[in-house]
């Protein structure tokens, strides 16, 4: 994890926190909000955070336990969605390269709003808002407690996730590159949970058994067939 203080504000925040591949980190924001960052995640916030607003900007995945402040809602702006909360616990997965963005609510209430449509949905605990970027559509589904946000405990978990998003997640955790020979299988879905120190070939074998894909490992590149 590294933290920078941007004197000349050229992006969205004065403070930027970044995790690298395979790295996870914890921090506490000035208002007492607790944040856990997953691998390859960038979080930014301004110097006036906690005074005039509680806006943060996220590219990647983070779990939040939000300090209560009814006068200043906590807002996560994340690659096409805004998530607003007052005091609650939730997870946002919003990597720039992923086809779907998810917000998972564990306690309290949050409002999730795509920036393009302004179609706001309200989540209750044990619900997930899934935003499909290609269709510009958001839907609310129940979540499996065994799968969501387990990355904080050292697990890689997928819940009906597209294969193309699973391989992006594996790239971030295993420092490899996936290449597809068959583009049509990117939309295959898979659910499962693995320890994040599990051998990559073991994970791929389980996915292969359940989806019928084939793969070949060429040093740091995995070819999906």
Predicted features along the sequence, with ranges:
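A residue-level detector for the "anchor" residue at the start of short, highly conserved motifs
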Residues: 1-225
